[in-house]
Amino acid sequence: MSQHTPDLPPELLPLAQMPLLKRLAARFFGHGLNRLRAQHRASWLHGQADGFRSGHTAGVEYGYQEGRLEGLEEGRQVLLIRDSRNTEHRPPGVDDRLFDDWRLPLSAELKKRFKADVARLLPAAAQPSAAQWKMIFSDTPATAVIAGAGAGKSTSLVLRLLLLHHYLGFELDAMTVVTFTRESRKDFITKLTQVFALWGRQLGAREARELVRTFHSRILPMVRSLPGFERLQAFENLSDRLQSGEDEVDSNPFDLRINDAQRRHLNACYQALYRDDPRFRVALQPLVRHALQLKELERDHPDVQKRMAVTELAAKRDEELCDTVEDLWFRAGAWPIKGIEPQRQRFEINGATFHSHGYCAELDAWVVLGFDPRESPQLTRPGAKLTVRAEWAVKRTLFQAFCRKPLIWLDSYEASKRSAGAFSAQVNGGPGFDYKVKGELASAPLLDCFVAAAGFIENLGLEVGDAVAGMSFAQDDPDRFFFEALSLFWRALEDHLLDQSPPIMSYNRMFALFSERSPENFKLLSDACLRPMSHLMIDEFQDVSPQIVSWIRASLAAIRCRGAALHIGRAAQHSSLLCVGDDWQSIYGWRGSSPKYFIEFNKEFPSPGTTRVMLSENYRSHQHVIDAAEHIVRAAPAIAGKKAKASGEATELWPVQVLDRDDQGLAQRLAEHYERGDSILMLFRKSSDKLLIENVISQIVNVDSSLSPGSRRLKQLTYHSAKGLQADAVFLLGDCQHLSSSPYKNQVYRMAGLGKDGDAEPYDSAQKDEILRLAYVGITRAAKHCYWYVDRQEGPSGNAPKASDRVPRDKPYFQDLRQAT
């Protein structure tokens, strides 16, 4: 609003301030102006200015008061209606923790009392260290204990159990201690009963066996509690000998050897499937041809070069040679063979004509009979200069180098009997031939290969059919047909086993029934059946498989889902998980185990609180043994911050000696230690080495085996079998080497989410790390002395990764006595 100030006259006085005459005159003239209705301009302007001044002042004051009140009111309204909340729709989060948010009720007074009792009842050597007490008194739902070799974890686990049961009143049927093998289970039960007895608690054998379990002995009662499976048998436990219930749960599920009882079921399933499923028969044909077909030989091979010179001479005598060999097979009752039509077929070999003995229509392949090794090697045709065996060797070499047709070469009468089922659509037994999956070190009977491959896939938590569907192979790769046949066979085998009376099921199938893929099955379990999984303590956790991990997580989730109703009226409430392990001792990746679940424990087992304990004391070995083993394994991925310290009795530091393979030298050194009264472990990389070395240490073996079991001081085992053992002197025979690449295992490893992102060969990479861990396990068995004998590597295998590559020459804890190559 614009403001205007009018122009005022110079001076205009009020009447009261004027003299009388002027006042009278002003009134007169003013009255006249009124009568004339005229305006006195100066007076009007003066009045206007005076009114403007007084009106403006009053208006400003009034407007200020009015505007202030209105502004406050409007401001107050804006403040009240402003909504600063997030308008985006946000649903509740998912609670994926496996445990309730709780803590073990351990008061300071209880801890003090328990420590005093331990100091009073256990010898000084068995007193826990500070780290072990941290493990025993862990009050969080989840606890990960990194316990290196010789860390004294067993005693700590026993004291943890004692704390829960004796001092907190936890019922035994709410707890489970899981050990990895039958042997470790027996050892732990012995220690448990001894310690409990010191506190006046006599633990019965049955109670102890119910408490201390293997994974497999815990899952079996779960499945047997389901309707219709009360008498269920585990396929891995089948045997022709009578078994008690305890023998059954104590059997070794990791024994990959197929016994007669198991093979009968495999063969019966194979026969039915071969008879009824054309697709299965078609898938098998390339496998049979690949297995039985004569293996090719390069033409520049020395044997080929030598025998090419007599090609014409060999061709001239070939028909007579065929007659001679055929007569031998006929007299042995091995010819003719069902499914093979006896007929001669001519082959052009290096420009000359040779013959076969028959044709197999089922395989679309020609058949040649070989010279059975049981026949006399001096057998000679009339007038011939060479023996039949030598003539046949020449023919075999020429066929290997120059024959490109499908050809089956039967080397012996026994081989023909084993393979009889492969030649005919009428199968009366098993497949009758061996197969070698790429990446495996040796061939094995086909059905054994099926069991091993399916077991590996299922250990990774995968279904066989789904895994096979996700694989891919080259068009002509026989493994493509192997896995197609496996997929068909495995489903048929599971159906066949369930049809038996009583029904049969593999352990892997049992774990899958109660895995994270099938949470609804837990609704079928009673509280009493599920409750023992509430408070789990697991030893050797680094060797668990994805399948086992899925079962553990699903069980803990089911327990939390049931809530307080599962524990009404009981001292043991909620649930907990305590895992003890050493990722440096994870050595079972070849059958599907992985240290990933221990290394990434917090991620794999989400909990409101997790305690991490590092048991760094080593009560077994001196520092040189510890440092040598850790130097080898440190290149493998591991939990950060690991460094063991010798905590046993002070002793002289002997370096780990690395030597060239010398069986006589090994035997002499072993004898010296035995005569000194040392305990000895003789560890082999390959079981076949045991037979070789026993010849040179037979005298000591005989002396030791004549003693009572408790007095024996020599044990011979593979590296893998030695876990948990120790000796004064350890002899390692053989390097730890990664020799082959497995295409199918690399594929299923990726499917299972194992390995690093972007790694095309995750299984092979894991195995290269595992050979370092295997060497670590071998070395850390030694309390005082360790001798490592390795073969000189020649040929293609010499370039393969091996643990001894990491042996340094400039460290005091190693003494490399190998001759430089």
Residue ranges and their predicted role:
Residues A174, T179-R317, R374-S376, K385-P445, ...:
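Conserved P-loop NTPase-based nucleic-acid remodeling module centered on helicase motor cores
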Residues P92-A149, S154-S156, T176, A208-F215, ...:
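Conserved helicase NTPase motor core
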Residues A352-A393, A415, W490, A557, ...:
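Short beta-strand-loop-alpha-helix junction that forms the active-site gateway
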Residues Q716-R750, C786:
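A short beta-strand element within the Helicase C-terminal
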Residues S740-R818:
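C-terminal accessory regions
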